[in-house]
Amino acid sequence: MTIKRKKVSVIGAGFTGATTAFLLAQKELADVVLVDIPQLENPTKGKALDMLEASPVQGFDANIIGTSDYADTADSDVVVITAGIARKPGMSRDDLVATNSKIMKSITRDIAKHSPNAIILVLTNPVDAMTYSVFKEAGFPKERVIGQSGVLDTARFRTFISQELNLSVKDITGFVLGGHGDDMVPLVRYSYAGGIPLETLIPKERLEAIVERTRKGGGEIVGLLGNGSAYYAPAASLVEMTEAILKDQRRVLPAIAYLEGEYGYSDLYLGVPVILGGNGIEKIIELELLADEKEALDRSVESVRNVMKVLV
């Protein structure tokens, strides 16, 4: 009897895509197909071969190939989209949204053709709007098109709390709701250190500073790098979500999900807590929010909807 190996395709072989592919292979979660445009096929093949040649040293058994041919992605269990352009000097936000939306639609058509049963994870920014664009183009059930930002934003939140308290990140739990931007909503009230509410451990003004740093977390990395944006933490976040799906772990994680009345919103993708498993989003978890938390989430939703107006 032949056992079918899991297969994950990563679209976009830049820093984030390549790092995601390598981490997936290192963890032996699946065989990996790294995809980029035809003009970058040789560099993509080179990166994949370089990763594969690390397998004897790292001790992992996973096949990795680079390609520009979507036929090589056929029958993927999960497809991760990291492709897209970054905002360039002189480019408006609307231009970025319109351009990346066109890229998403083209990629999605190829995914749907070759892997009609796949679960799609979207990272490309602005991620809430891009996930919506992929969903509309794919025609997949909503639970199989998911955006990634909450795991990353929550990881940043947990990191800063860990540093503040000088405690292991393993003991820090938290949630960040809303869109992936300055209006995201880190939920202090649902965040703990070893089961102890943060509000009993960290002064209010320090918590507010941590929340603000979390909101600006991506920009902080961009400013320090000088060129480009974060990729290690985004890649690790994608891998955590992919693992939850491939292993049907039913993890409670923040993810960008399609809402149909949850939290009082409909027809948009927004970061909320979900149960993530073998079918994708198994359930959206609705938290009880205080008035100020709901107001903050409303502002975040307004920002997401403003971006979505530009979708083509």
UniProtKB/Swiss-Prot annotation:
Belongs to the LDH/MDH superfamily. MDH type 3 family. One of its GO terms (biological process) is lactate metabolic process. It catalyses: (S)-malate + NAD(+) = oxaloacetate + NADH + H(+). SUPFAM superfamilies: LDH C-terminal domain-like (SSF56327), NAD(P)-binding Rossmann-fold domains (SSF51735). NCBIfam families: MalateDH_bact, PRK06223.1. Its EC number is 1.1.1.37. NAD(+) binds at residues 12-17, 36, 100, 123-125. Signal peptide: none annotated. This is Malate dehydrogenase. GO terms for molecular function: L-lactate dehydrogenase activity; L-malate dehydrogenase (NAD+) activity. Catalyzes the reversible oxidation of malate to oxaloacetate. It comes from Bacillus mycoides (strain KBAB4). Gene3D superfamilies: Lactate dehydrogenase/glycoside hydrolase, family 4, C-terminal (3.90.110.10), NAD(P)-binding Rossmann-like Domain (3.40.50.720). It comes from the Bacteria. Keywords: NAD, Oxidoreductase, Phosphoprotein, Tricarboxylic acid cycle. PANTHER family: L-2-HYDROXYCARBOXYLATE DEHYDROGENASE (NAD(P)(+)), L-LACTATE DEHYDROGENASE. The gene is mdh. The modification Phosphoserine is found at residue 149. The active site is at 180 (proton acceptor). Pfam families: Ldh_1_C (PF02866), Ldh_1_N (PF00056). Substrate binds at residues 87, 93, 125, 156.
